[in-house]
Swiss-Prot record:
Tissue specificity comment: Expression is constant during tumor growth and markedly decreases when cell proliferation stops.
Family annotation (InterPro entries): 6-Pfructokinase_euk, ATP_PFK, PFK_vert-type, Phosphofructokinase_CS, Phosphofructokinase_dom, PKF_sf
Protein name: ATP-dependent 6-phosphofructokinase, platelet type
Chain positions with N6-acetyllysine modification: K394, K485, K687
Region (Interdomain linker): 399-410
Residue positions the entry lists as glycosylated: S539
Gene this chain is encoded by: Pfkp
Tree of life domain: Eukaryota
UniProt modification remark: GlcNAcylation decreases enzyme activity.
Modified residues (Phosphotyrosine): Y650
Binding site for substrate: S172, I173, D174, R209, M216, G217, R218, E272, R300, H306, V307, Q308, R309
């Protein structure tokens, strides 16, 4: 396939020169607690390092291996990291090391590295591991001079390896490191928690039980908070935000109110480091005793423990770790003696580099604030995302009494449009509850625009959407029908129900529908109200947003299926599988699925390919069969080519590979739209929908009873995530950046990740580094 030169933000794209790491050596180690996705990071560092011409060394058993040296430091080969993407934990081991804390231990470590010429260190671990690496870097020249004085190394070695470069990647399920949106392993840990919560819900409902779930996280409440948000928990206990003094009474009142509303189960989530206002621990057993004593509810405690560290990494963690690994190698190759140690981090969908010690300092400041009971400051220091999650949870979990809600006298309708996508129901629940909290009357429209025209609309209450977060598909019902032929009837329904604003949750059809409603404003006054669309489609093809609700769940389905298929191919030997994914003309699922599953190739519409490309892929796979990895995996987007169909590619591979490998095909189909939503989709759907309702409330404020008509472009928008921010973009502006024929945006951010997929599959590719991390200050990073 031809390499895609993605458009760059700078005037001149900056490409990674092949073999720019020639003569350099990189050591990679994992330290501290293990986390799912560490292996994906190790794989990316090894393969990107080898691709650039550098030597890469495994350092086994973390810092202990660094101190012990010998067989603990081994050169890594390309094939060493095959088949590890789907494995949890870390294949190179991790251990706590007292020896490295002493200068004597670090002296041994420096000697081991200098003798092998390793002057680039990639550390995957938590804040303690990264702090140790930075100290080692600072002491490096002094350590080498001492080794030379002791006669362990010669003076030439001191001169040649005079400085050590250090780059960190944060591998921790706790997500407790300041400066990064997500640490490697957090998303997978959330998958484990949500799997347990979903399983517990059925047994709790059968018996009308209360469950107290204790999750990990040490002194960081991220896992507990997001779990509570994604499963609609009744109560959550966090170290950063202890409950008020009379929390026992308030919690029992909330639980009994929910039970009185016919809710058959209560879920309380407790972070293992939960404390009260006096910094005294709140344990799951204490909560159970309280509920049993005060309410007499049948209550059970489940401590999830190390289950959260285990299992297969999620698609998100594999992609995150692969991107971070590639970025870490580039950062090491670009480093100079003056460059401070950095940590590669994620902000929105962008890889950034941040000064390591600034991040460590801020992480320690959070703990200090908690120790000194400055809890509001601790929440702020955790970052915008944590604070946003906490505020959203509070709004959705606790309903004020009706008499305390200030009525807006506005009616807001919610509608699902397009194909079903996992997470739609979480978005509807969030919209309904935020709308009610803002004093609006909320209306649900059933079966899309067709149902709207037929009057399938009714008021929906707070309790009506209870338990919707974990439900897949669309409970309201959704259709691809556009509003065009029903405009008169829809306008009548808007008028008769006095609808003052409309929230549309859906895919490309929802976007087209919004454009049709915008065009009909001149003719129909009923459409002169604020309208906003939240993207929800597995295809991730809505202009104005880098991600859409449902795409992450579909990606996990593809990744899980590919893992099983790869296992089948490994057992059979010399077999290549062709997998067809959904997405219409958008290659997001095929490309990102290939990156997450470790595929050999992905055919997508956005990057035209010809018979020559197909033949070169066959040659590549033929060469691969001569190695120890005797299997192949190729993904194909369903609409990537009119003539090069899945059947055609299957037949071509079968014929050309005759005698070397055999071939099988698999069309994944509608299984990609189904299943329970992933934690990411539940959380994203909840937050983006809440943000959309805040926008509607702000627009409606003060307009009721004034007869104000909303006719400006900025009153009909798409809300999407763009790079680092949630943005409202008028559909009138988005028209310019839309390829209507193929139903995709004209520019797509993920195409820049395409070379990563190729490089990790052993192809040569032009990797555009224009967006590669410039070292940012943490303060600037937090303000964005």
């Amino acid at each position: 396939m031809s390499d895609l030169d993605s458009s760059s933000s700078s005037a001149y794209p900056k490409y990674l020169e092949h073999l720019s790491g020639d003569g350099k050596a990189i050591g990679v180690l994992t330290s501290g607690g293990d986390a799912q996705g560490m292996n994906a990071a190790v794989r990316a560092v090894v393969r990107m390092g080898i691709y650039t011409g550098a030597k890469v060394y495994f350092i086994y058993e973390g810092y202990q291996g660094l101190v012990d040296g010998g067989s603990n430091i081994v050169e890594a080969k390309w094939d060493c990291v095959s088949s590890i993407l789907q494995v949890g934990g870390t294949i190179i081991g991790s251990a706590r090391c007292k020896a490295f804390r002493s200068r004597e231990g670090r002296l041994k470590a420096a000697c081991n590295l200098a003798r092998l010429g390793i002057t680039n260190l990639c550390v995957i671990g938590g804040d303690g591991s990264l702090t140790g690496a930075n100290l080692f870097r600072k002491e490096w020249s002094g350590l080498l001079e001492e080794l030379a004085r002791n006669g362990d190394i010669d003076n030439d070695t001191v001169q040649k390896y005079s400085y050590l470069n250090v780059v960190g990647m944060v591998g921790s399920i706790d997500n407790d490191f300041c400066g990064t949106d997500m640490t490697i392993g957090t998303d997978s840990a959330l998958h484990r928690i949500i799997e347990v919560v979903d399983a517990i819900m059925t047994t709790a409902q059968s018996h009308q039980r209360t469950f107290v779930l204790e999750v990990m996280g040490r002194h960081c409440g991220y896992l507990a908070l997001v779990s509570a948000l994604t499963c609609g928990a009744d109560w959550v206990f966090l170290p950063e935000s202890p409950p008020e003094e009379d929390w026992e009474e308030n919690m029992c009142l909330k639980l009994s109110e929910n039970r009185a509303r016919k809710k058959r189960l209560n879920i309380i989530i407790v972070s293992e480091g939960a404390i009260d206002m006096q910094n005294k621990p709140i344990t799951s057993e204490k909560i159970k005793e309280l509920v049993v004593k005060n309410l007499g509810f049948d209550t059970r405690v489940t401590i999830l423990g190390h289950v959260q560290r285990g299992g297969t990494p999620s698609a998100f963690d594999r992609i995150l770790a692969s991107r971070m690994g590639v970025e870490a190698v580039i950062a090491l190759l670009e480093a100079t003696p003056e460059t401070p140690a950095c940590v590669v981090s994620l902000r929105g969908n962008q890889a950034v580099r941040l000064p390591l010690m600034e991040c460590v300092q801020m992480t320690q400041d959070v703990q200090k604030a908690m120790d000194e009971r400055r809890f509001k400051e601790a929440v702020k220091l955790r970052g915008r995302r944590f604070e946003g999650n906490l505020n959203t949870y509070k709004r959705l979990a606790i309903k004020l009494p009706d008499e305390k809600i200030v009525k807006s006298n506005c009616n807001v309708a919610v509608i699902n449009v397009g194909a079903p996508a996992a997470g739609m129901n979480a978005a509807v629940r969030s919209a309904v509850r935020v709308g009610i909290a803002d004093g609006h009357k909320m209306f649900a429209i059933y079966d899309g625009f067709e149902g709207f025209a037929n009057g399938q609309i009714k008021e929906i209450g707070w309790a009506d959407v209870g338990g919707w977060t974990g439900q897949g598909g669309s409970i309201l019902g959704t259709k691809r029908t556009l509003p065009g032929k029903y405009l008169e009837k829809i306008a009548e329904q808007m008028h008769s129900h006095s609808i003052n604003a409309l929230l549309i949750i859906g895919g490309f059809e929802a976007y087209l529908g919004l454009l049709e409603l915008a065009a009909a404003r001149e003719k129909h006054e009923a459409f002169c109200v604020p309208m906003v669309m939240v993207p929800a489609t597995v295809s991730n093809n809505v202009p104005g947003s880098d991600f859409s609700i449902g795409a992450d769940t579909a990606l996990n389905t593809i990744t899980d299926t590919c893992d099983r298929i790869k296992q089948s191919a490994s057992g059979t030997k010399r077999r290549v599988f062709i997998i067809e994914t959904m997405g219409g003309y958008c290659g997001y699922l095929a490309n990102m699925g290939a990156l997450a599953a470790g595929a050999d190739a992905a055919y997508i519409f956005e990057e035209p390919f010809d018979i020559g490309d197909l033949q070169s892929n066959v040659v590549h796979l033929t060469e691969k069969m001569k190695t120890s990895i005797q299997r192949g995996l190729v993904l194909r987007n369903e609409s990537c080519s009119v003539n090069y169909t899945t059947d055609f590619i299957y037949q071509l591979y079968s014929e050309e590979g005759k005698g070397v490998f055999d071939c099988r095909k698999n069309v994944l189909g509608h299984m990609q739209q189904g299943g329970a939503p992933s934690p990411f989709d539940r959380n994203f759907g909840t937050k983006i929908s809440a943000k959309a309702m805040e926008w509607i409330s702000a627009k409606l404020k003060g307009s009721q009873g004034t007869g104000k008509k909303f006719v400006s472009d900025d009153s009909i928008c798409v809300l999407g995530i763009c790079k680092r921010d949630l943005l409202f973009q008028p559909v009138a502006e988005l028209k310019k950046v839309t390829d209507f024929e193929h139903r995709i945006p004209k520019e797509q951010w993920w195409l820049k990740l395409r070379p990563i997929m190729k490089i990790l599959a052993k192809y040569e590719a032009s990797y555009d580094m224009s967006d590669s991390g410039k070292l940012e200050s943490l303060q600037h990073h937090e303000e964005l």
